[in-house]
């Protein structure tokens, strides 16, 4: 049995002058049936609420202010789920709406609850349709794009594959719209991904979406580090999903690492919000990165922010480059007290245990 997550972007769902959003969903849904009939499981992460809301309200360009974005998302989400329900019901498929914000994944308990709910739904042969809850999320609590959200959903359910449907055929060495010599990249191994991502070789943001290729590369990095294969495919070609379901290599394939970091450390790395920052000396940075050590108070040079036990912090080196994230074993007040030599014989106290520390 396979469990796949498919992320459907706004650029796909908006359709064209010849194809409506409903027709796009119909084309997609028909390709799902043979995959599901073999006992496989599917979760969709969908964008499109803001775009549909703007269509409904006759707003010609994507709003810039948060309140209008949230209002159009509220209107559009109703239309979006209505279309999914109408189309999938014709095929005898049941769906469920799941709306998520960053806060829902911020604690380990809520992350696990979301995971259990999603897994139970697919056990019941229901297709969960996930979207960010744009109506209530403020800027601080927004993922801002569903590419990142789709990777976290894939990790939460231990998916075998994440498929990113977009409006380009595959990843390119340069932006193909502006560079005739751009070369397609068919395969990306994890050792290559960070360099490609950091170069930000394309930035194909469109008017209606919030992602672009850069967020898809971030999504691929998150998922592959957690052991999930990622495939980036042109979703405007309705034959492509059939090709994917037949295990054909089209688009760009991102291979997972051989030794995934595990569900818990994936959550620490990518889902949790940090509330403080700890700067390490060079010795502590080396011990954490190369020896898998816990962070001890003796290796701490500076503390920023206020935090209590079990809250998440960003851990950086002397150049302010992120080394890791982790859950602290002591409060910021206690740690500052140690650094200020107000307490003696506490330099060996554990600040972040290696079991709750994830390398960046």
Swiss-Prot record:
<feature type="binding site">
    <location>
        <position position="134"/>
    </location>
    <ligand>
        <name>substrate</name>
    </ligand>
</feature>
<protein>
    <recommendedName>
        <fullName>Glutamate 5-kinase</fullName>
        <ecNumber>2.7.2.11</ecNumber>
    </recommendedName>
</protein>
<comment type="pathway">
    <text>Amino-acid biosynthesis; L-proline biosynthesis; L-glutamate 5-semialdehyde from L-glutamate: step 1/2.</text>
</comment>
<comment type="similarity">
    <text>Belongs to the glutamate 5-kinase family.</text>
</comment>
<dbReference type="Pfam" id="PF01472">
    <property type="entry name" value="PUA"/>
</dbReference>
<dbReference type="InterPro" id="IPR041739">
    <property type="entry name" value="G5K_ProB"/>
</dbReference>
<keyword id="KW-0028">Amino-acid biosynthesis</keyword>
<keyword id="KW-0067">ATP-binding</keyword>
<feature type="binding site">
    <location>
        <position position="47"/>
    </location>
    <ligand>
        <name>substrate</name>
    </ligand>
</feature>
<dbReference type="GO" id="GO:0003723">
    <property type="term" value="F:RNA binding"/>
</dbReference>
<keyword id="KW-0808">Transferase</keyword>
<dbReference type="GO" id="GO:0005524">
    <property type="term" value="F:ATP binding"/>
</dbReference>
<feature type="binding site">
    <location>
        <position position="7"/>
    </location>
    <ligand>
        <name>ATP</name>
    </ligand>
</feature>
<feature type="binding site">
    <location>
        <begin position="166"/>
        <end position="167"/>
    </location>
    <ligand>
        <name>ATP</name>
    </ligand>
</feature>
<feature type="binding site">
    <location>
        <begin position="210"/>
        <end position="216"/>
    </location>
    <ligand>
        <name>ATP</name>
    </ligand>
</feature>
<feature type="binding site">
    <location>
        <position position="146"/>
    </location>
    <ligand>
        <name>substrate</name>
    </ligand>
</feature>
<dbReference type="Pfam" id="PF00696">
    <property type="entry name" value="AA_kinase"/>
</dbReference>
<dbReference type="InterPro" id="IPR001057">
    <property type="entry name" value="Glu/AcGlu_kinase"/>
</dbReference>
<dbReference type="GO" id="GO:0055129">
    <property type="term" value="P:L-proline biosynthetic process"/>
</dbReference>
<dbReference type="InterPro" id="IPR005715">
    <property type="entry name" value="Glu_5kinase/COase_Synthase"/>
</dbReference>
<dbReference type="InterPro" id="IPR011529">
    <property type="entry name" value="Glu_5kinase"/>
</dbReference>
<dbReference type="InterPro" id="IPR019797">
    <property type="entry name" value="Glutamate_5-kinase_CS"/>
</dbReference>
<dbReference type="InterPro" id="IPR001048">
    <property type="entry name" value="Asp/Glu/Uridylate_kinase"/>
</dbReference>
<keyword id="KW-0641">Proline biosynthesis</keyword>
<dbReference type="InterPro" id="IPR036974">
    <property type="entry name" value="PUA_sf"/>
</dbReference>
<dbReference type="GO" id="GO:0005829">
    <property type="term" value="C:cytosol"/>
</dbReference>
<dbReference type="GO" id="GO:0004349">
    <property type="term" value="F:glutamate 5-kinase activity"/>
</dbReference>
<keyword id="KW-0963">Cytoplasm</keyword>
<keyword id="KW-0547">Nucleotide-binding</keyword>
<comment type="function">
    <text>Catalyzes the transfer of a phosphate group to glutamate to form L-glutamate 5-phosphate.</text>
</comment>
<keyword id="KW-0418">Kinase</keyword>
<feature type="domain" description="PUA">
    <location>
        <begin position="275"/>
        <end position="356"/>
    </location>
</feature>
<dbReference type="InterPro" id="IPR015947">
    <property type="entry name" value="PUA-like_sf"/>
</dbReference>
<dbReference type="InterPro" id="IPR002478">
    <property type="entry name" value="PUA"/>
</dbReference>
<dbReference type="InterPro" id="IPR036393">
    <property type="entry name" value="AceGlu_kinase-like_sf"/>
</dbReference>
